[in-house]
Amino acid sequence: MAMKIARVEPGSEAEVLGLGPGDELLSVDENELNDSLDYDFYTDSKSFHLKARVADGIREWDVQRTERGPFGCDFQTYLGDQKHSCSNHCMFCFIDQLPPGMRESLYFKDDDERLSFLFGNYITMTNMQDHEIDRIIKMHISPINISVHTTNPQLRVRMLANKRGGEVLKYLPRLVEGGIAVNCQLVLCRGINDGDELRRTLSDLLELTPMVQSIAAVPCGVTDYREKPFKQTPYDAKTSAEVIDIMEEFGDECKRRHGKRIIYPSDEWYLKAGRPIPPEEFYEDFDQLENGVGMMRLYASEFLAELEKPHRIYGTKKMDVVTGEMASPLIHQMMAELHRQYPMVEVTVHTIKNKFFGGNVGVAGLVTATDIIAQCEGKLTSGTLGVPAVMLREEKDTFLDDITTDQLAQRLGVKVEVLPTSGGDEARALLRSGLHIARRRRA
């Protein structure tokens, strides 16, 4: 394998050696470089032997350094080889429920421990072998995010449809004993891995604390494109409340024993159960934001805190914004409070029902431009439509259905403004403009 250089830091030791864009690093101390983690680990030394492919052939250097630290290379990609693809056929897999005709990259299922560390992806470990666990421990690649779902080996085999699903659970204690911090995800399927099975899973994982540093439970998503024979019944208010009660019971016990809760239901459970989102202190360090744990509480706290500050407002401002069904009540509440404190700013909220995926998916991050167009055309009250950044892919201008923000703007005949994810940043964006200092209206 080889790591192709995209950029060399000016003045770095890599530049002194004459390395530049297009050159390929092959090995350090005869250790092959498969990814940026190998590079970081093996070059973090005062001396090493480097082998590279440059314009005139293979060159080698004995590098002597005064101190450890970054060597100075940035690469075209974090991985020198291919992403490790998923070998499971999980009964709850959302990618298997995507509609046909979407971009090819969306159908790729990765299960790569390197992306877990680099980007926070969750892995099941079913395609990992002992030497890869040894590498994680040796390089102290920590934390690792693991999709556990259940600690019952037989049930995990069934849920992942992979005969190694139960066997690889042995890697959890090995990682923990090796000093690797672990964040755990539980995708719960009604009547399958909740109830007593959830209690068993939480009990087993608590035995691995404090290196298991967080455990989040999220409900299985169900779309109209499920082709697998696994029947999934969506959670209702009663069954969602049962999950919350179990998670909070174990979280309370963990807090008594270890001083930290670490066990969190995602926001969706509270919304389904009709219960209020817990206060900010419940979420401690917000370790599981990417799983939708505490996201609404943090958003509201930041949004309201920003409204406490004076802002410059240029005259009056009208704007439309879109959101998903799950966040809709909170967004309506925040926009009403914004208007109460700053009457010159009026925001109309449009709740988008996710018909693209079949109506059972309520999160804002899965709203498509197709649904926005169908449900907002002719109904907008202003010349600007605010779109949450979470609805867009990594390119930051394209929805899941491959429609760009420019295309959306052209279709609706308005300017499209991408709104930041954090509550504070969004409040500032909505208030941006002004000829004078607008003092918020007090109660």
Describe each PLM feature range.
Residues 58, 65-211, 221-250:
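Conserved Radical SAM active-site core
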Residues 27-51:
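PDZ domains, with a preference for the canonical peptide-binding region formed by the helix
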Residues 191-192, 212-239, 258-281, 353-360, ...:
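Flexible glycine/acidic-rich beta-alpha junction loops that bind and position SAM and/or redox cofactors
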